[in-house]
């Protein structure tokens, strides 16, 4: 069983390979497909935006079955996302959850520009991001994205009786991070 520290190191090393264009492209062959057909054992869970420019398996140079990925616009944490993380932690025993925000997030920009009028379910998305706007030192999208990823990680740590004991016992670490679209670097928050 891998520890949270080792999982985080593995993600950082994979991101370094991605940034330097020296990717290994692991676990992307027929043998791996056959292996994971029997079950999955991801070493980390990643909650990230649905933005097509933010594919965690590529950013971290991982392959099929390595990451348990939950994608939702604005990397928001809803009850459904919490349930998915609970499944990953309690049943798949992932030791690490990363809430990954990113530069240029359209959901954050939409929440900043929101005037109270929108059709459909977009106001639901905006309502989850608005507290991060209020808590942000600035009103620019990048500042809000950083605060928002940290806020969503905090929400996960505190909001569920299933995750809190795992975090308290250090069986699970929940961290926030930010992906820079220009440099390719994923920066883990302190």
Where are these regions (language model features)?
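Divalent-metal-activated hydrolytic enzyme cores
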Residues: 1-39, 65, 75-94, 106-190
């Amino acid at each position: 069983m891998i520890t949270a520290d080792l999982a985080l190191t593995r993600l950082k090393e994979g991101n370094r390979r991605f940034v330097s264009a020296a990717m290994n492209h692991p676990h992307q062959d027929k043998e791996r497909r056959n292996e994971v057909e029997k079950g999955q054992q991801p070493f980390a869970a990643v909650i990230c935006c649905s933005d097509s420019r933010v594919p965690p398996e590529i950013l971290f140079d991982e392959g099929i079955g390595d990451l348990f990925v939950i994608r939702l616009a604005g990397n928001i944490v809803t009850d459904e996302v919490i349930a998915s993380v609970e499944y990953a932690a309690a049943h798949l025993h992932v030791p690490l959850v990363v809430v990954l925000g990113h530069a240029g997030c359209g959901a954050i920009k939409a929440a900043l520009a929101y005037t109270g009028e929108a059709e459909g379910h977009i106001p639901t998305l905006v309502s989850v991001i608005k507290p991060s706007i209020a808590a942000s030192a600035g009103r620019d999208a990048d500042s809000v994205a950083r605060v928002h990823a940290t806020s969503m990680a905090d929400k996960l740590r505190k909001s569920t009786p299933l995750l809190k004991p795992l975090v308290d016992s250090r069986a699970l670490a929940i961290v926030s991070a930010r992906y820079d679209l220009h440099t390719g670097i994923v920066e883990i928050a302190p």
